[in-house]
């Protein structure tokens, strides 16, 4: 969990309600975007990465036939079973994407899922907000930069 949220509920209860044997990773869906092209544009507008990196990743995904509408995670809340092989492999592949291509995690995570045919569980925003409260810290940071 990053600094976008404050904990307001019982985390033991939260985990008991979401964890299943079927899934090893849990994320929120991105609240505003579900296409990689939209995320590329946003990263470019906010200058969160260099144009060179953005174009390089775009071209790579295009060559691999990565579908534009493959969903996007909202990386502020990640719940994972750390000793699950599927989770470990996914995280290692994701790290390699970030290390070698773009440091923007939301550009690469859904690509890794697609590339390896892996599944995650998307958590309902309404459900999560029983346990976490957004604090808009990222919005405040952007205003003052």
Q: How would you name each of these model-derived features?
A:
Residues 1-145:
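Glycosyltransferase catalytic domains, chiefly GT-A lineage
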């Amino acid at each position: 969990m990053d600094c976008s949220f404050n904990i307001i509920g019982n985390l033991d209860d939260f985990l008991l309600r979401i964890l299943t044997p079927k899934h090893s990773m849990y994320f929120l869906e991105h609240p505003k975007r579900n296409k990689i092209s939209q995320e590329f544009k946003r990263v470019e507008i906010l200058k969160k990465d260099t144009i060179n990196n953005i174009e390089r990743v775009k071209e790579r995904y295009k060559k691999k036939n990565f579908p534009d509408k493959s969903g996007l995670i909202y990386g502020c809340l990640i719940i994972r079973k750390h000793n699950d092989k599927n989770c470990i492999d996914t995280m290692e592949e994701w790290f390699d994407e970030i290390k070698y291509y773009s440091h923007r995690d939301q550009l690469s995570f859904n690509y890794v899922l697609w590339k390896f045919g892996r599944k995650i569980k998307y958590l309902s925003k309404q459900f999560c907000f029983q346990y976490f409260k957004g604090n808009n810290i990222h919005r405040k940071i952007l205003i003052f930069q």
